[in-house]
Protein backbone atom coordinates (compact mmCIF):
# COMPACT_ATOMS: atom_id res chain seq x y z
CA UNK A 1 0.00 0.00 0.00
CA UNK A 2 1.49 3.33 -1.04
CA UNK A 3 1.33 6.62 0.89
CA UNK A 4 -1.73 7.93 -0.99
CA UNK A 5 -3.66 4.73 -0.28
CA UNK A 6 -2.68 4.83 3.41
CA UNK A 7 -3.87 8.45 3.58
CA UNK A 8 -7.17 7.55 1.88
CA UNK A 9 -7.67 4.69 4.35
CA UNK A 10 -7.00 7.00 7.32
CA UNK A 11 -9.56 9.50 6.02
CA UNK A 12 -12.19 6.75 5.68
CA UNK A 13 -11.49 5.54 9.23
CA UNK A 14 -11.67 9.11 10.59
CA UNK A 15 -14.97 9.83 8.85
CA UNK A 16 -16.52 6.59 10.14
CA UNK A 17 -15.18 7.28 13.65
CA UNK A 18 -16.46 10.86 13.69
CA UNK A 19 -19.97 9.74 12.77
CA UNK A 20 -20.03 6.78 15.18
CA UNK A 21 -18.84 8.87 18.15
CA UNK A 22 -20.99 11.93 17.56
CA UNK A 23 -18.28 14.30 16.40
CA UNK A 24 -15.34 12.99 18.43
CA UNK A 25 -12.05 12.07 16.83
CA UNK A 26 -8.46 11.34 17.75
CA UNK A 27 -6.45 8.31 18.77
CA UNK A 28 -8.03 7.77 22.20
CA UNK A 29 -11.53 8.15 20.71
CA UNK A 30 -10.59 5.68 17.99
CA UNK A 31 -9.38 3.13 20.52
CA UNK A 32 -12.53 3.56 22.60
CA UNK A 33 -14.76 3.15 19.53
CA UNK A 34 -12.83 0.09 18.38
CA UNK A 35 -13.39 -1.58 21.76
CA UNK A 36 -16.98 -0.47 22.41
CA UNK A 37 -18.75 0.24 19.09
CA UNK A 38 -19.37 -2.91 16.99
CA UNK A 39 -20.34 -0.95 13.85
CA UNK A 40 -17.06 0.97 13.87
CA UNK A 41 -14.99 -2.14 14.58
CA UNK A 42 -16.63 -3.95 11.67
CA UNK A 43 -16.02 -1.02 9.30
CA UNK A 44 -12.40 -0.71 10.47
CA UNK A 45 -11.62 -4.20 9.17
CA UNK A 46 -13.84 -3.90 6.08
CA UNK A 47 -11.99 -0.72 5.05
CA UNK A 48 -8.59 -2.33 5.65
CA UNK A 49 -9.51 -5.45 3.65
CA UNK A 50 -10.83 -3.31 0.78
CA UNK A 51 -7.79 -1.02 0.68
CA UNK A 52 -5.20 -3.80 0.87
CA UNK A 53 -7.04 -5.60 -1.94
CA UNK A 54 -7.13 -2.42 -4.05
CA UNK A 55 -3.39 -1.97 -3.60
CA UNK A 56 -2.77 -5.32 -5.29
CA UNK A 57 -1.89 -7.16 -2.12
CA UNK A 58 -4.40 -9.98 -2.47
CA UNK A 59 -2.11 -12.54 -0.83
CA UNK A 60 -0.18 -10.29 1.51
CA UNK A 61 -0.28 -10.81 5.27
CA UNK A 62 -2.12 -7.51 5.98
CA UNK A 63 -4.85 -8.37 3.46
CA UNK A 64 -5.26 -11.93 4.69
CA UNK A 65 -5.36 -10.76 8.32
CA UNK A 66 -7.93 -8.07 7.49
CA UNK A 67 -10.09 -10.57 5.59
CA UNK A 68 -9.90 -13.03 8.48
CA UNK A 69 -10.99 -10.39 11.03
CA UNK A 70 -13.70 -9.11 8.69
CA UNK A 71 -15.08 -12.62 8.25
CA UNK A 72 -14.95 -13.28 12.00
CA UNK A 73 -16.86 -10.07 12.75
CA UNK A 74 -19.44 -10.85 10.04
CA UNK A 75 -20.45 -13.93 12.02
CA UNK A 76 -20.05 -12.33 15.45
CA UNK A 77 -22.22 -9.28 14.70
CA UNK A 78 -24.52 -10.63 12.00
CA UNK A 79 -23.38 -8.05 9.46
CA UNK A 80 -23.00 -9.46 5.96
CA UNK A 81 -21.33 -6.67 4.00
CA UNK A 82 -18.59 -7.93 1.66
CA UNK A 83 -15.39 -5.87 1.70
CA UNK A 84 -15.74 -5.47 -2.09
CA UNK A 85 -18.86 -3.30 -1.63
CA UNK A 86 -18.38 0.34 -2.64
CA UNK A 87 -19.12 2.40 0.49
CA UNK A 88 -18.45 6.13 0.83
CA UNK A 89 -16.91 7.77 3.90
CA UNK A 90 -18.91 8.33 7.08
CA UNK A 91 -20.82 5.02 6.98
CA UNK A 92 -22.78 4.57 10.21
CA UNK A 93 -24.14 1.27 11.52
CA UNK A 94 -26.56 2.26 14.30
CA UNK A 95 -27.30 -1.22 15.61
CA UNK A 96 -26.00 -4.53 14.38
CA UNK A 97 -27.59 -7.86 13.50
CA UNK A 98 -29.34 -9.18 10.42
CA UNK A 99 -27.71 -6.69 8.02
CA UNK A 100 -27.23 -8.04 4.48
CA UNK A 101 -25.83 -5.97 1.60
CA UNK A 102 -24.95 -7.28 -1.87
CA UNK A 103 -21.32 -6.71 -2.87
CA UNK A 104 -22.29 -4.89 -6.10
CA UNK A 105 -24.33 -2.22 -4.27
CA UNK A 106 -22.97 1.35 -4.37
CA UNK A 107 -23.43 3.39 -1.18
CA UNK A 108 -22.72 7.13 -0.99
CA UNK A 109 -21.14 9.10 1.84
CA UNK A 110 -22.76 9.63 5.25
CA UNK A 111 -25.32 6.83 5.05
CA UNK A 112 -26.96 5.41 8.21
CA UNK A 113 -28.21 1.84 8.36
CA UNK A 114 -30.01 0.07 11.16
CA UNK A 115 -30.45 -3.53 12.26
CA UNK A 116 -32.27 -5.95 9.96
CA UNK A 117 -31.57 -3.99 6.75
CA UNK A 118 -31.34 -5.85 3.44
CA UNK A 119 -29.99 -4.16 0.31
CA UNK A 120 -30.01 -6.76 -2.41
CA UNK A 121 -30.20 -7.85 -6.00
CA UNK A 122 -33.19 -8.61 -8.19
CA UNK A 123 -32.46 -11.31 -10.75
CA UNK A 124 -35.34 -10.69 -13.14
CA UNK A 125 -37.91 -8.16 -14.28
CA UNK A 126 -37.60 -4.50 -15.18
CA UNK A 127 -35.57 -3.75 -12.02
CA UNK A 128 -32.99 -6.51 -12.49
CA UNK A 129 -29.79 -5.42 -10.73
CA UNK A 130 -28.72 -3.80 -7.46
CA UNK A 131 -29.53 -0.49 -5.72
CA UNK A 132 -27.50 2.71 -5.70
CA UNK A 133 -27.82 4.60 -2.42
CA UNK A 134 -27.19 8.36 -2.53
CA UNK A 135 -25.41 10.38 0.11
CA UNK A 136 -26.96 11.31 3.44
CA UNK A 137 -29.57 8.53 3.35
CA UNK A 138 -31.15 7.07 6.50
CA UNK A 139 -32.32 3.43 6.29
CA UNK A 140 -34.54 2.36 9.18
CA UNK A 141 -34.71 -1.01 10.98
CA UNK A 142 -35.90 -3.94 8.89
CA UNK A 143 -36.00 -1.98 5.63
CA UNK A 144 -35.51 -3.83 2.35
CA UNK A 145 -34.18 -2.17 -0.81
CA UNK A 146 -34.06 -4.52 -3.76
CA UNK A 147 -33.35 -4.32 -7.49
CA UNK A 148 -31.88 -1.66 -9.73
CA UNK A 149 -33.31 1.30 -7.84
CA UNK A 150 -31.80 4.67 -7.05
CA UNK A 151 -32.31 6.14 -3.59
CA UNK A 152 -31.90 9.90 -3.86
CA UNK A 153 -29.63 12.09 -1.76
CA UNK A 154 -30.97 12.90 1.71
CA UNK A 155 -33.79 10.34 1.65
CA UNK A 156 -35.16 8.51 4.68
CA UNK A 157 -36.58 4.99 4.52
CA UNK A 158 -38.88 4.00 7.37
CA UNK A 159 -38.81 0.84 9.45
CA UNK A 160 -39.80 -2.33 7.57
CA UNK A 161 -40.35 -0.46 4.29
CA UNK A 162 -39.79 -2.41 1.06
CA UNK A 163 -38.30 -0.18 -1.64
CA UNK A 164 -38.66 -1.48 -5.21
CA UNK A 165 -38.83 1.86 -7.08
CA UNK A 166 -36.59 4.93 -7.36
CA UNK A 167 -36.82 7.55 -4.62
CA UNK A 168 -36.25 11.23 -5.36
CA UNK A 169 -33.98 13.43 -3.26
CA UNK A 170 -35.21 14.12 0.29
CA UNK A 171 -38.00 11.57 0.01
CA UNK A 172 -39.41 9.93 3.12
CA UNK A 173 -40.64 6.46 2.17
CA UNK A 174 -42.69 3.99 4.21
CA UNK A 175 -44.85 0.94 3.70
CA UNK A 176 -44.93 -2.26 1.67
CA UNK A 177 -44.33 -1.49 -1.12
CA UNK A 178 -42.73 1.78 -0.05
CA UNK A 179 -44.32 5.02 -1.16
CA UNK A 180 -43.22 8.60 -0.60
CA UNK A 181 -45.11 10.15 2.31
CA UNK A 182 -43.19 13.44 2.56
CA UNK A 183 -40.15 15.32 1.28
CA UNK A 184 -38.62 16.19 4.66
CA UNK A 185 -35.76 13.77 4.02
CA UNK A 186 -33.22 12.49 6.52
CA UNK A 187 -32.63 15.79 8.35
CA UNK A 188 -32.21 15.06 12.05
CA UNK A 189 -31.43 11.39 11.45
CA UNK A 190 -28.11 11.69 9.61
CA UNK A 191 -25.82 13.80 11.79
CA UNK A 192 -22.13 14.59 12.34
CA UNK A 193 -21.25 14.87 8.67
CA UNK A 194 -18.84 17.79 9.19
CA UNK A 195 -15.73 15.66 9.66
CA UNK A 196 -12.43 17.01 8.30
CA UNK A 197 -11.66 15.72 4.83
CA UNK A 198 -7.95 16.44 4.77
Predicted regions and their residues:
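Terminal amphipathic alpha-helical/low-complexity segments used for targeting or macromolecular assembly
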Residues: 1-77, 188-198
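Broad hydrophobic/π-residue packing in well-ordered secondary structure
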Residues: 36, 43-53, 114-115, 138-140, ...
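Conserved beta-strand-loop-alpha-helix hinge in the C-terminal portion
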Residues: 171, 176-193
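Left-handed beta-helix
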Residues: 77, 82-83, 88-89, 94-103, ...
Amino acid sequence: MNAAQRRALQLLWRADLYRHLGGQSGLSAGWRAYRLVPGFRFMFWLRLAAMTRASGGLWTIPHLAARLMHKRLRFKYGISIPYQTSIGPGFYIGHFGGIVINEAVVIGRNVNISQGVTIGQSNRGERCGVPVIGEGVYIGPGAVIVGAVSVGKGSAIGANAVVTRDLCENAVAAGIPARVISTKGSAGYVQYCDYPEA
